[in-house]
Amino acid sequence: MKVRNSLRSLKNKPGAQVVRRRGKVYVINKKEPRFKARQG
């Protein structure tokens, strides 16, 4: 899991989902788990 300032490039990857949990924004990607990230 990476912490990124901007998730814009990650959310364009195939299989990416943008999820809000507890006020934080996450990108989860089942196809490519290395693209998991959190913003903030």
Curated annotation (Swiss-Prot):
Keywords: Ribonucleoprotein, Ribosomal protein. InterPro entries: Ribosomal_bL36, Ribosomal_bL36_sp, Ribosomal_L36_bact. GO terms for biological process: translation. GO terms for molecular function: structural constituent of ribosome. This is Large ribosomal subunit protein bL36. It comes from Corynebacterium glutamicum (strain ATCC 13032 / DSM 20300 / JCM 1318 / BCRC 11384 / CCUG 27702 / LMG 3730 / NBRC 12168 / NCIMB 10025 / NRRL B-2784 / 534). The keyword Ribosomal protein applies. It holds the Pfam family Ribosomal_L36. Coiled coil: none annotated. GO terms for cellular component: ribonucleoprotein complex; ribosome. Belongs to the bacterial ribosomal protein bL36 family. The keyword Transcription regulation does not apply. It comes from the Bacteria.
